[in-house]
């Protein structure tokens, strides 16, 4: 199976998982990226089964609206049963690295509100130790050099993602060469740097369920 076919399979598996638990008042949190796009397209086949969605990026909001799915502001929603999103890496504890698409801050906010965070990914994203994928950090623009110096002190090699401005008007530093053996601690350390909005470690609030597309089919993993 191609990578896109694996993504399509996990996206469909996520829809199959949440659909029986939705009703006409349900609002679904939806992530950002290529795998999340497959989820949106699969979910759209059942748009009468739920009320609408909260989007983690402008791009996701546009795709949802294109399918005729109502998109709500998070501030107007009292609860989210599910948040479904992809990841750049996951470990066996379902700690994630996200933010390859630069939507990490809004993704993290929506994930924090959701009762159940379902991560969907192809099998290549499951790794023994996080950090081979550079860790994205969203930064207030004027603090970019200061934050980069602090990230070097933490052992990383930050690279400015040129030409990228987040939906929040900020910039991204991608931190290379990190061996992330304690993701919860590192997430807190980076977020404590003045000028950091947030970073792409989802460890304080990891995924609850990982649906992994493999050549043998979709595997369902809960945190070890």
Swiss-Prot record:
The keyword Cell inner membrane does not apply. One of its GO terms (cellular component) is cytosol. Pathway: Carbohydrate degradation; pentose phosphate pathway; D-ribose 5-phosphate from D-ribulose 5-phosphate (non-oxidative stage): step 1/1. Gene3D superfamilies: 3.30.70.260, 3.40.50.1360. The keyword Glycoprotein does not apply. It holds the Pfam family Rib_5-P_isom_A. This is Ribose-5-phosphate isomerase A. The lineage of its organism: Bacteria, Pseudomonadati, Pseudomonadota, Gammaproteobacteria, Pseudomonadales. The gene is rpiA.
């Amino acid at each position: 199976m191609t990578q896109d076919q694996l993504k399509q399979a996990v996206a469909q598996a996520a829809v199959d998982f949440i659909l029986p638990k939705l009703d006409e008042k349900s609002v679904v949190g939806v992530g950002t990226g290529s795998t999340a796009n497959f989820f949106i397209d699969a979910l759209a086949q059942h748009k009468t089964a739920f009320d609408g969605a909260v989007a983690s990026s402008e791009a996701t909001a546009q795709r949802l609206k294109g399918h005729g799915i109502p998109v709500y502001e998070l501030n107007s929603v009292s609860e989210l049963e599910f948040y479904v999103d992809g990841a750049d890496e996951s470990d066996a504890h379902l700690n994630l690295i996200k933010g390859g698409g630069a939507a990490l801050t809004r993704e993290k906010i929506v994930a924090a509100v959701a009762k159940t965070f379902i991560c969907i990914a192809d099998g290549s994203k499951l790794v023994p130790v996080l950090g081979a994928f550079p860790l994205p950090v969203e930064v207030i623009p004027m603090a970019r050099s200061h934050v980069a110096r602090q990230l070097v002190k933490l052992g990383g090699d930050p690279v400015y993602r040129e030409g990228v401005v987040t939906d929040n008007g900020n910039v991204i530093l991608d931190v290379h060469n990190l061996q992330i053996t304690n993701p919860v601690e590192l997430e807190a350390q980076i977020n404590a740097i003045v000028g950091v909005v947030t970073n792409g470690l989802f460890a304080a609030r990891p995924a609850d369920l990982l649906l992994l597309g493999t050549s043998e089919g979709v595997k369902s993993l809960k945190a070890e």
